[in-house]
Amino acid sequence: MITAPRTLLFLLASSLAFAQGGRGGPGGFGGPGAQLDMEGKGAEAREAFQKAYDSAATPAAKAQALRNIAMSWAFEGNCKKTAEYEDKVIEYWKTQEAEQPGNAFYQEGEMADEAARVCIDYGDLDTAAAYYKKGRDLGAKEPNIAAGRKDLWEYRYQHALARLAARRGNKAEAQKQVEAARATLERMKTDDPNLYQQQIGFLPYLTGYVAYYAGDYQTALADFQKDTRNDAFITAMMAMAYEKLGDNAKAKEYWQKAAGARGHNPPAAFAVPTARKKLGE
């Protein structure tokens, strides 16, 4: 469900460094098509990605192109189209379940969570909720799943439920899910200490997000400032918090940072277009 760009994603056996709702997205930066998306030229980007799909020599390469198309739609805030193409990528991974179950089920969950992330960021909460559940369910189907990875899927889902509740104005439910996520992290600390170290850094994103939608903008800022990932979405949320606090100069500073983000992934898909609109670009 949370950013670091991945290279050769579809060949990796494990991508566990990617956490709640802001995971990296298609391998590398995505080439010329990704640059076109960054410039707001989505139709041209998808034409480039479609050509890559048509010329791809392997099913894995075709799946990569489909995922790039999904992210292209994300840059336009199109939740439904993003989900449609992520579903196509999931279908590819279903064909890999027998050969590489330790990766295939994980990637199925990743793709569903990626669609969910785009949907929640752009306000389609019902679709986001459905895809977050789908992501948890798909990922947890992994045969002989390790305890730490099982914790990971629970943590991601609780993280998502807290954010969804916060967006819907249900402060009590949001806080309940934050505490559930904390408890799962504590369990992960024992089950898989290395995975715990990867995931604990994403907690300020959650607490800051919940604080922001509860109207506590100072706490939101303080929490976001604890996030050391240089995440484009967090940068955009800091700009939003400064706006709410009436500090337009700081808001502009952070919108400019968000507009300059690089990445072909859900955080950038929200941050870059939103920042450019705010700045009148």
Locate each region found by the language model:
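Disordered, low-complexity segments in secreted/periplasmic proteins that are enriched in proline
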Residues: 18-32
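"A position-specific structural signal for the A-helix of alpha-solenoid helical repeats
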Residues: 31, 68, 107-110, 114, ...
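TPR/TPR-like (Sel1-like) alpha-helical repeat modules
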Residues: 87-91, 136, 179-183, 248-266
